[in-house]
Amino acid sequence: WQKLDAAVPALAAAPFRLTPENFLGRHSFPLGFDRDTQRLYFASNADRDTYGIYCLNLQTGLRTDLAIEHRKLDLADPGDALRTEQLVYDRVGKKVVGVRMNAPAWPTTAWFDPELNAVQQSLERGAQKSVVQILEWDAKRENFLVHLAGEYDPGAFMIFRRTAAKLQERARCAPELTPEVLNRSLPFSFDASAGRRLSGVVTYPRSPRIVPPPVLVYFHDGPWGRDVPGFNR
């Protein structure tokens, strides 16, 4: 066994060891290993106000060049330590190729692989205001299993044929939830009087019993969580 704090003295200001004193302060936490177990992906708020995502070479004890950061948003939740759903593995290449994250506008995937990043950007351009998740692909990276969901659409699983640049729907999610029964949800944001940018999602009732309908404000769990656009059943 190897203590991470001893292996990475450079992160002494934001240690991996969790204490009541640093839980809401500066600390680091692991997300998961690469397939060779020599690289550890982790999140840290060392020398910054938000959690970024990084990679540690366990053989050298040094960080790699990987750094995914956002000045205003936490890209990982300390409560999700070692939940590997955030890491995307390539079963063919047997390595981590991306990280799922809640981007400023829409949830997306930060790909380390340029080829997969190009596919992601192509799909997002063709499906604006949608959450696009590439789930699987074949060895030649010709056929991709993709999940697309909209602002108030539970979405569908699709096959993307890369050469033909075509999406083929294969299965709907919650097909009983048709547009006729769904309430419309849209993201919003505004500058508060203190100058801080606030954002959220507003749901408009389809058939309100009171006009205008009352407003119910629901705050997300904190302190790191935040509401993001996309379907919420």
Features from the language model and the residues they span:
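Structural cue for short, hydrophobic secondary-structure segments
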Residues: 218-221
